[in-house]
């Protein structure tokens, strides 16, 4: 069974993954699901936002200033009852692509990494809690990213 997700901006993902962009996002998610040994198929929303929208989200939910690459909002059980809906991921491609240029890497390489990072946050991998959590989160993020890059060439 496939996970259920919705994407608000298919044009960007068509450029990234080609005509079958949903298969690309599904591939990312299935590799993460396999890596985490999940036995269920959660639902999530993937939203592409502008820098101005991301600034507002960053201030509203994280109490931080400025734009950022990815924000994940987890639904907690009291909000949704028993549900497979786990949350929403907001990506800001303009910020991600600017950052990619600054560090000298491929736009799509960094976008994939941010997508993985966002999905891991939905599973409560929180690198900001402690150094140990950061090590575990980055280990999973690197391993999953490497596996995706070995399967999906861009």
From Swiss-Prot:
Cofactor(s) required for function per UniProt: Zn(2+)
Pfam families documented for this protein: YbeY
Chief localization: cytoplasm
UniProt-listed Enzyme Commission number(s): 3.1.-.-
GO molecular function: metalloendopeptidase activity; RNA endonuclease activity; zinc ion binding
UniProt xrefs under Gene3D superfamilies: Metalloproteases ('zincins'), catalytic domain
Subcellular location: Cytoplasm
Disrupted gene: phenotype observed: Probably essential, it was not disrupted in a global transposon mutagenesis study.
GO CC annotation: cytoplasm
Protein name, per record: Endoribonuclease YbeY
Originating species: Mycoplasma genitalium (strain ATCC 33530 / DSM 19775 / NCTC 10195 / G37)
């Amino acid at each position: 069974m496939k996970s259920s997700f919705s994407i608000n901006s298919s044009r960007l993902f068509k450029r990234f993954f080609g005509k079958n962009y949903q298969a690309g996002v599904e591939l990312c998610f299935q590799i993460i699901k396999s890596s985490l040994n999940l036995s269920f198929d959660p639902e999530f929303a993937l939203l592409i936002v502008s820098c101005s929208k991301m600034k507002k989200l960053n201030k509203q939910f994280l109490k931080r200033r400025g734009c950022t690459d990815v924000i994940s909002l987890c639904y907690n059980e009291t909000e949704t009852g028993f549900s497979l809906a786990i949350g929403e991921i907001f990506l800001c491609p303009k910020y991600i692509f600017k950052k990619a240029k600054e560090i000298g890497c491929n736009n799509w390489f960094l976008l994939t990494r941010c997508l993985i990072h966002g999905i891991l946050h939905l599973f409560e991998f929180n690198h900001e809690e402690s150094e140990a959590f950061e090590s575990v989160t980055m280990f999973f993020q690197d391993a999953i990213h490497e596996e995706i890059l070995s399967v999906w060439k861009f």
